[in-house]
Each structure stands twice: as C-alpha cells, then as structure tokens.
Amino acid sequence: MVTRRHLLRSIAAAAALAAGSVPLAAGAADRGPVVVELFTSQGCSSCPAADKFLAELAGRGDVIALSFHVDYWNYMGWTDPFSRADNSARQRAYKHAMGLRYVYTPQMVVDGRSQAIGNEREAVERLIEAAAERPRLPVGLVQKGTTITVTVPGREDAEPAVVWLVVFDRTQVTKVERGENSGRSMVNAHVVHSVMPIGKWLGQPLQLTYTSDALAANRGAAVLVQKKGTGPILGAAMIRPPTS
C-alpha cells in the first residue's frame, strides 16, 4: 500500500534528483549526444572525404561533431590556418590511451573510447551506434553572451573527470594553394577554435560559470565531461553556432 507520506517522499526525492542534489545510481543516466572528434588537416589528400562526412554528422541532433586540425602536416607545403599544436597533443594523448602505434589523419575518435579511419563511414557509424547505447551523464549548458553555465548531476561511485570547454566555428572555407590539396576549395565544419579545461567533476553535483572572449556570438560551444582528460567521455552538451 502506498501511503501519502511515502508518495510525498518519492516526489521530494524526484525533485531533488532533478535539481542535482541526489547522486544518480551508477547505471542511471540519459541517452545524450555522442561526441565525434575528427583529427584532420588541409594538407592531407585523404581528409576531404572525412571533412565532408563530419559536416553531415554536424547536422545531426544525436552527435556533437568537432573538427580538430593538427599541425604535423604543415611541413608538406601548406600550413593549415586552423591547425593547433594543442589539437595534435590531444590526438597523441588518445594514441597513448588507446594503445595505438602512431597518429594519423583522418582519424575519428568516438566518445573518447574508440576510433576509426575518418573516411570509413560504415565503421564510424557502427561506433556511433554502439556509443549511443551507453548511459551517460545529462550535462546542462546555457550561454549568455560570453558566459556559460554548466550543470552536471552527481553520480555514485564516479571517477574524477575534467570538464572541457570546446569553442568552434560553424564553417570555414579555404582556397588551398599548395600541398596535396593544391587548387581545392576546402570546406570545414565545426572547426575547433580553442579547448580549455574549466573545472573538475568529482562525482558530486556541479554547477560552474565560465566567461571567455572566445565565446563570440558567431561561435558554438561544447562541454565535455571526460575521465582522465582524454579518457572516456561521460557526458556532453552543445550550443550550436548561429546559421548566419
């Protein structure tokens, strides 16, 4: 028999959980978006097909697609204007975490757990489907001007994680004048502008506010809650850049 007192306690517990004050059970979480990171370069002739695929993924509601341009192709005749040493370092960290022998482009990393050649669509889609079945933390993200507010609920028996802020441009178009893609007009979607750690999640309910000039009105923002910095992504949220 359900008593009125029991019912009120249940309602209060549910309200507290929604507010983030009650830790989630270890297996309890939402089915949020899957994070796909493409490591690419405008100097790589194998990358345009992967760039096009990422642009398609960027239009999906169940995927957070991010394009990380690496700098180790720059010596081949064309300096990718969006390449960043930090992006190459992030890819190398994944290499070590996943036990890979080398870094390469185009590479897609899915939820920080698995990887595939970026232009092999079927392989990447299988990884996305598998990732979508895993429970994940429901991450809240609100932006006002150059300030964001991030909320992450608590979870029992959780390992510490880094909260990353990734700022990205919607689309960049570049006429490549040298290198393997000389003469091509390269279209890159969700090009990463900056990546920065903005906090740590220790398993307890978290709310943090962060302000950065990088959060310009014409850029998008993604927040990744990721174990060990470049380990499995536990949850993520995104604010899309404007369409015009």
Where do the protein language model's features map onto the residues?
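Active-site-proximal cofactor/substrate-binding loop regions of enzyme domains
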Residues: 2, 27-96
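N-terminal export leaders
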Residues: 4-9
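Sec-dependent N-terminal signal peptides
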Residues: 10-16
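Short, conserved sequence motifs used for protein processing/export or organelle targeting and
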Residues: 81-105, 113-244
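N-terminal signal peptide c-region/cleavage motif recognized by signal peptidases
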Residues: 19-23
